[in-house]
Every structure is written in C-alpha cells, then in structure tokens.
A protein has these predicted regions:
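Boundary detector for helix-to-coil junctions that initiate low-complexity/charged tails
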Residues: 2-7, 18-44, 289-294, 706-952
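A conserved mid-protein helix/loop that constitutes part of the nucleotide-sugar donor-binding site
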Residues: 75, 343-348, 520-543, 563
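Acidic donor-binding segment of Leloir-type glycosyltransferases
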Residues: 85-123
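Nucleotide-activated donor-binding/catalytic signature segment of Leloir-type glycosyltransferases, i.e.
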Residues: 119, 380-387, 566-584
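Glycine-rich, basic loop-to-helix element that forms the pyrophosphate-binding segment
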Residues: 125-142
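Conserved donor NDP-sugar-binding/catalytic core segment of glycosyltransferases
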Residues: 159-190
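Aromatic "clamp/platform" in nucleotide-sugar-dependent glycosyltransferases that forms part
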Residues: 604
C-alpha cells in the first residue's frame, strides 16, 4: 500500500488535481474517471446516497455469486450491505460463510441475513478456519458463472459489479477483472495499480481485493491456500498469472477498501512482522521461477476485427431492476463530461430532472479526460464510460441491455455521433421508447457541418429534434424540410439565482491574480481551439495595450492550441498582461466572472454561447462575434455583437471600436451589465429550460406511443453502423498517430530551438571572448608601461630606503627591549588572571552552595508556612470545639440541676412511702397481737395522712 500514488490528505481532503490523470497502459481508448474532488466526499456519497436499484426477487440462475467470509462482523456490515444489495446489477446471489463467530451480536446479525434478502445464502463452519477456508466453502456452493470476492467492511460503487460483468462478457480472453480502488478510514488515498501490471505482482499485491473471476477459470486452478492466515488472495492471483490467466483493471474507482490500522489483515501483519515476512517470502518462492522465465509486459484489451457477428452479439442474461417510475426513465448518450457549453447544459438538465424524479442512466462514448465526471456522478451513479468496459462493436448490445434492464422510456442524444447510428436498430426493436436529440450548433469543420447533418439524415428515427436556437431550427429546415414538425427550440439558459456578481470574491480573485484596482479585466472563458479563435483574442488585447489602455486578459481554458497561443503572447512580450488559468469547475468560474469587467468572445461559430448567458447574469458586458443565434440573446442595449470577419486587421479594428469605449467608460459598462442581467432574469432563467424540456419529454412519450415505427432495412442499418465503426476506429487511430507525430514534432521543435539557442549562445560567447581578450591585451600593455615606470622609481628610492632601513634597525632593537619588558608584564598579568580565574571558580562554587542553601531555606519556609497554616486551622478548630463544649457544659449543668431537684423530690416521696410502710407495719403488728384499738388508732392516723375517706 505504501507504493500507491495520488495520495489525498486525510486531514484536509485536498482537491485531486489533473496531475493524477494517467495514460492507461498506453491505451488511449480508455479514460480514467476520478469520482469526486476528494476521497472523503466519494465515500460519504456512497454511504449516504439512497438508491432504488434493488430487485428483491432472487434469481433461480444467478450470473454472479458474491463470496464473503463472516467472522465477528458487526461494526461496518450495514454500510457494506447497502452498497451490495443496491448494485445496478441485481442478478446475483450472496453466499456468506460464518467462520465460527464468537460474538453474540455478530451471530445474531448473521442469523438474520436470509430474512433481510432472498439473495443471501448462509453456511457455517464448526471451527474457525480462516478467511481462505471461508471463501472456499462459499465457492463450493456458488451457482453463478462469475465469482465476486467481497470483504464485509468495504464499499462498492453502485455500478461496480455490472461493469465487471459487462467487461468479462465481451472480453473472453480475460479471466478476471478489478478496478482502481479508494482507500479510506484510517488512511485516504487513490490506488491505481492492478492486473494491467502483472510483472509488478511478485513484488506486491496490486489489487485490494474486490475482483470478478470466471468460475470455470477459477476452478481450473483451485481455491485459496487455507494454510495462509493472510496474503491468501495475493498468492491466488500470483498462481493465476503464473498459469497464463490474465486480468484487467478498469480505470475507474469502483470500490472502497477500508484501511484499518488497529484491526484486520494490515494490523495482523504489523503485529507479527517476522511471520509476515516469512509468509511473503514463501509466496514469492512459489512463483519466482515462473515470473523470471516469462517476460510479463503490461496488458491491454485488444479490439476484435470487424465482424458482423460481433455486432450481432447480445448479452444472454437479464438484469431487470425494480423501477416503478414509469415515463421518467431516461438513457442519455453524451460524448464527454468536461468543460464546455454542451456539457454544462447536460449537467444543468440532468441535475434538475433528477430533482423532479427522473431516473437517469448516462453512457459516455468518447475516451478523454472527463473533468466533470464527479459532478455528473453526484446526480446519478448510473454512468457508463463505454470505452472503459466494452469494445465499440458491443455498444449496440449494451444499449439493448440497458433499455431492457432499466425499462427505459426515453433515449436522449446530446452530441454523440455514435448514438445516432444505433437509432435504426433501437427504434425498430423498441417502438414504445421515445428518441430525442439535442443540438447546440453547426460545426463547419466537423463531419460536414457536424451534428445538424447527421440529425437531419436520421430524422426518421427521431421522435423529436430539439435545438438551442431559432437560428439552428431554420438551418435544420434548410437541410431537411421534413424535420419541421419534429423541431422544438429550447435555449440552454442560466441559473440566475446562482450566477450573481460577488463583490467579495471579485476583490479576492483580483488580488490573487495581481490585477490593480484601475485595470480593466477582460475575460476569455473558452477552450483553446480554432472555434474560439484565441489568436484573434491575443491580437485584440495587443492593440488595446498599444493604445496605452490599462487592461488585463484572463484566459480560463486549455486545449491543443495552448502552446501556440502562449508562444504568440511571448513573442508580443505581453506576459505581464495575460493571466492564463486552466479550466475551472462551474462553481469556481463564477468567481472569475465577478472579477472581470468585460467578456470578449470572438468565436468562429457558435449556437448561443453559454459563456454569454453566464456573463449577462453576472452583469458583465458582452463583446462577441455575431454568429449563430447569439443575436437572439444579446440585444443592442445588453451587449455588443461584432460581424465575423477574416481575423485580419479590419476585424480587430471592429472589435476595438466597441471595446475602447467600454474600457474607458465605467458608467457604460455598468449600464450595459444591468440591462443584460435584467434580460436573462426575465426571459432566460434555468427553470424555463427545464420546464420546456420536461414538456418536450411528456409530448414525445405520447408521440412515440402513437406513431408508427419507420421501416428499417436491417442489412442497410448494419452496413451503415459497420461503416461508421470502421471510420470511427480509423479516425481514432489517425488521431492517436497524429498525437504521437505532433508530440514527435514538438520534441524536434524543442531540440531545434535548443540548438538555435545554443548556437546563438556559443556565437555570442565567442564574440564576447574575443572582445575580452582584446581588452586584456590592452590592459597588459598598460601594465607593462606602469611596471617600467615603477622600476625607475624603485631605483631612485633605493638609497633613501637604505638609510631609512638603518634607522629602522635601531628602532627595532629598542622595540625588542621594550618587548621583553612587555613579556615580563604579560607574564605577571597572566598569573593575576589565573588567580582571578581561581577566585571566579571559587565564587561560582560558593554561589552554587548558596543557591542550594537558599533553595533549601525556601523549601523550609514553604514547609513552615504550610505548618503555620495547619496550626492556624487547628487553633480555629479547637476554638470552635471549645465553644461547642462550653455550650454543652452549660446545657448539662442545667440538666444536672433538674436531676438534683428531681432526686430530692423522689427522696421526699421515698420518705413518705417509708412512713406509710411503718404505719401499715404497726397496724399489721397490732392486728396480729389482737390489739384492735391500737390498730384502729394507727389506721385512722394513716387515713388522715393519706387523706382517705374510707368507711369501716
């Protein structure tokens, strides 16, 4: 994993730049697709997006068997489950083997799986046997023609399995396929290695685990080595490569590998480094000879020869998705996803259709760098870059398959030549499906005026033809009058709520680009191609500079004329005037419009340029070529249109006649900008475009159901498609060869320039060297003359120096004597310094002792202060206790007095009782002695004492 490139910071989530784009194995027929601006955004999108691809019905004969081993899985399973169960390919079974889990919650989760989905089949191990054994057990029960290996904590793009299946179905020479991977969790990076680099596999595992393997080819070599507790997948891939099975890695990021530092395979390897090294060397030793005896080169899919049987190929399986959104299921064919007006229109349209409940599937037909892919992916993940998965001979089969799988209602073509040649087949086979195309402009330099020509030629197979301007609608009717009833005009419009001038960003961007406050910024947001006439733009700016006008040109764009344009700028010495930046995302482009004062677009041809819509919405005055339908948008009070000329001085002067007043008059710019925004807000808001397109979609659905399908000659249609494919392939190869030739020419040009520069430098250096030699010769002659004069002067001075020398000798002797005295004093001083040094050392040692004593004293004082505080606290406590004791003593004293009084009362009562007892005793004694009268007398005494009134 450490060898991966394209690292994205986990802390900052930095933007993935264009530098990450690579040429895929030297095969220009494929495109690398970057999913999102950073790893975290992509992963969050997979985890949070709600998808409706699931078909709950289990297949009796599944095409794919997903293989998973389950051991105490719990934490991340739900995320994995959702990305698997919501795949766009639903013809699968999911076999999960419980490798004797011990966690009760994990066991309960496992036992609930068959109830959650009819596609899941579960099996058990009685003992824990490891990941390899779990996979092997699952494979034994697999019924699919393909095996897909899935760990239960990773994530998948919704189209992952489907793209793998489509690839292997149309590339029988390959046994397995994977994709680029996104590493996330504890580490975030993009992994772009894979099976297209087989020679690298002996050094490291080039894939992160999720691959689709033909079951027949897998069974031929057997399962995973169950003796290996880790790296069992690496060992199995090496076995396949060593036995001449080949695989491919699709250059798209279709799976996410959870990189965990504290658990999992990586953690196990780190915790037991010696075992990891032993297993690694064991695996390498098994296949080192096979890799060394064979020279493995990078692999690339080969395009089959033109064969009508390939054209008639059809996928022999079904994949019906559970789609209920009838009437709103759209298959869109687009050529690319990059900076440009047509792609921005598609982005706006698809985004709003998705918000209105449409289900969109997008097919890309051109291999290039799709800079805006991730923005379309944010609208719908159901995107297929056809060159990455299929040969063009199989694109017709793909279209048939998708229409059936997604139950497509509408097929929408936007600037895709290839899709037009599929129309005769699709219109004939799917009469209930509506077919619409959308065209932005004519193109005089492409295929004979471009898309309008092919649209008009195949108009009978289109239910409706939508154009971006009335100008283009009129042009269609000239090409083919029969298109009149099918034509609809829908302008691309602009989101006026989003596209507003941002004054804070204006200053920020101008400061960043070094544009002074008084400079007028002129914006050129376009690809550097002949259509946009970048050289004419440079000429116009140069003339403005010649007139001493303070202007700065901002160019947003790039393409194959970039180097030539830069060379022209350098030749005119205008580097300080131009700010050239690469194409930006739509949200970022707004900032540059806000920073600009004028939009200048001297195009060769246009429909209605999207840049003009955007500039008018941001209140930037427009100066553009009067071509196409641009007069339908730009009126005299809202901008300036200049008649297209020959790109000569006269046309430059025509632009200057408009630009100079705008540059010099701020009030004019402000007035035109406000009027422009008012016009687009009133007549061209984006909502109007979406409403219009939805109205057309509804109308065309009804037309398709009522119209009679046109007659199709299958042989002629087939021949036309083959002709186009041959021409398309020839053009692709020529373009590739032209690029190589152009690259070679550029290299030769660089070498020629280097040689010329070297020759000029050498000539200049030789001339300078001769001049320097002549200068040095003249200096030498002058120096010799000076030496001669100096010799004469020295001879005349010799005698006087001799006398002076004698005097100096006497002075030296006196100096020596004085020096001896100084030496004596110096020795005394040295001894004194040594004494001072000893004293200093003694004082330093004493200082350290005093410092220690002071520190001890400070600590003792601290202790004394603490003890004093404790004593004070104790005294306060004793005083409070004494007060309590005094109160208690007073209380007990009172109680004691009460007790004493009570005691005296009790003693008195006791005395009384004793007297009573004595009287009773006397009575009893008298009665016993029959002394009745004594007893009676005693009785009466007792009665009187007691106060009794008792009769005898």
């Amino acid at each position: 994993l450490e060898i991966a490139i394209g690292v994205v910071s986990a802390q900052t989530g930095d933007r993935i730049t264009d530098s990450l784009a690579i040429e895929v194995s030297g095969d220009s027929t494929m495109s690398e697709l970057i999913p999102y601006p950073n790893v975290r955004a992509f992963v969050n999108g997979l985890q949070s997006r709600e998808l409706d691809f699931e078909n709950p019905v289990a297949s009796a004969e599944p095409v794919v068997s997903i293989i998973s081993s389950f051991y105490n899985v719990r934490d991340y399973f739900e995320q994995t489950y959702q990305t698997v169960i919501c795949q766009t390919f639903q013809n699968f079974e999911w076999i999960i083997v419980n490798d004797c889990s011990t966690d009760p919650e994990a066991i309960a989760l496992f036992e609930s799986l068959p109830e959650r989905s009819a596609k899941i089949r579960t099996f058990h191990h009685d003992t824990n046997r490891g990941l390899a054994a779990g996979r092997n057990t699952a494979i034994q029960h697999a019924r699919g023609r393909y095996l897909f290996f899935m760990d239960l904590d990773d994530l998948l793009d919704p189209t992952c399995i489907e793209k793998f299946v489509l690839f292997l179905e149309t590339h029988p020479e390959f046994s397995f396929v994977s994709s680029y991977s996104v590493l996330f969790h504890d580490r975030e990076l993009l992994w772009i290695h894979g099976f297209h680099e087989p020679a690298e596999f002996l050094d490291r595992n080039g894939v992160t685990g999720r691959i689709l393997y033909r079951k027949a080819d897998f069974d031929e070599l057997g399962g995973f080595d169950e003796d290996l507790r880790f790296y069992e997948d690496w060992e199995r891939w090496l076995k396949a490569i060593a036995n001449n099975q080949i695989g491919w890695t699709i250059p798209e990021f279709l799976d996410c590998y959870r990189h965990k530092n504290k658990s999992g395979l990586l953690a196990s390897a780190k915790q037991n480094v010696e075992e990891e090294q032993r297993v690694s060397e064991l695996i390498r030793s098994r296949y080192r000879d096979a890799f060394e005896t064979r020279k493995l080169s990078e692999i690339a899919p080969t395009r089959p020869d033109f064969d009508v049987r390939e054209l008639r190929f059809q996928f022999d399986f079904e994949n019906p998705l559970d789609r209920t959104n009838e009437g709103k299921r759209v298959l869109c064919f687009v050529p690319q996803m990059k900076v440009g007006g047509s792609d921005k229109f598609n982005l706006d349209l698809f985004g709003h259709l998705q918000q209105r409940g449409y289900d969109l599937t997008i097919a890309i037909t051109i291999s290039t760098q799709h800079d805006w892919y991730w923005q379309f992916h944010d609208i719908t993940p159901d995107i297929f870059c056809l060159p990455n998965c299929l040969h063009d001979l199989h694109w017709l089969a793909f279209a048939r398959y998708i229409i059936k799988s997604r139950q497509i209602d509408i097929v929408f073509l936007s600037n895709s030549y290839f899709a037009y040649y599929l129309l005769p087949f699709l219109q004939h086979e799917f009469p209930d499906v509506a077919f619409i195309d959308y065209t932005h402009t004519d193109d005089p330099g492409s295929y004979g005026i471009g898309y309008p020509r092919v649209s008009c030629q195949l108009a009978q197979f289109l239910d409706t033809q939508v154009v971006a301007s009335q100008y283009l609608a009129n042009y269609y009717q000239q090409l083919n009058p029969e298109t009149q009833d099918k034509l609809r005009v829908c302008r691309i419009n602009v989101d006026t709520q989003k596209w507003q001038r941002d004054f804070d960003k204006r200053q920020e961007i101008r400061d960043r680009l070094g544009i002074s406050p008084d400079a007028i910024a002129i914006l050129f947001p376009a690809r550097i191609v002949p259509q946009k006439r970048p050289f004419l733009f440079v000429d116009i700016i140069a003339k403005l500079v010649e007139r001493n006008l303070s202007v700065v040109a901002i160019i947003l764009g790039s393409d194959y004329l970039y180097d030539d344009m830069q060379a022209k700028i350098d030749k005119l010495d205008l580097q300080s005037v131009f700010r050239i930046l690469p194409s930006a995302a739509p949200d970022e482009v707004i900032e540059f419009y806000s920073a600009s004062d004028i939009l200048l677009l001297p195009s060769e041809y246009e429909g209605i340029s999207l840049a003009i819509y955007e500039a008018m919405s941001v209140q930037v005055p427009v100066v553009a070529a009067d071509v196409g339908g641009q007069a339908e948008l730009v009126t005299p009070e809202t901008g300036f249109l200049v008649p297209k000329g020959q790109g000569d001085a006269a046309e430059v002067e025509a632009y200057l006649n408009v630009l100079v007043p705008l540059v010099e008059d701020a009030n004019l710019r402000d007035r035109v900008g406000k009027a422009a925004r008012e016009r687009v807000v009133r007549h061209f808001p984006l909502e109007n475009m979406v409403d219009r397109m939805e109205e057309i979609f509804t109308e065309v659905r009804q037309l398709a159901q009522n119209n009679t399908p046109p007659d199709v000659n299958p042989v002629l249609a087939e021949e036309s498609l083959i002709w186009f494919l041959e021409y398309f392939e020839f053009e692709r190869r020529m373009a590739s060869q032209w690029q190589k030739t152009q690259s070679w020419v550029n290299e030769l040009q660089k070498h020629r320039d280097w040689l010329e520069q070297k020759y000029r430098q050498e000539g200049e250096q030789s001339r300078q060297w001769i001049q320097e030699l002549q200068t040095q010769l003249e200096r030498s002659r002058q120096w010799i003359e000076q030496l001669e004069a100096s010799r004469n002067w020295f001879e005349s001075q010799y005698q006087s120096w001799k006398e002076t020398a004698q005097q100096r000798q006497e002075e030296i002797e006196r100096s020596q004597q004085w020096n001896q005295e100084l030496q004596t004093q110096l020795e005394q001083s040295r001894q004194w310094v040594e004494q001072l040094e000893a004293s200093r050392n003694w004082f330093e040692s004493q200082y350290q002792n005093w410092k220690q004593i002071a520190e001890q004293t400070r600590q003792e004082l601290e202790q004394a202060r603490d003890w004093s505080e404790q004593l004070q606290a104790g005294r306060d406590w004793f005083e409070s206790q004494l007060h309590e004791w005094q109160n208690s003593a007073r209380y007990h004293q009172g109680e004691l007095e009460k007790t004493r009084a009570e005691l005296e009362r009790v003693q008195a009562m006791a005395k009384t009782e004793r007297d009573r007892a004595e009287q009773l005793e006397a009575i009893i004694t008298a009665m016993e002695s029959s002394k009745f009268w004594q007893a009676r007398s005693a009785w009466f005494k007792l009665k009187q004492r007691l106060g009794l009134e008792v009769e005898d």
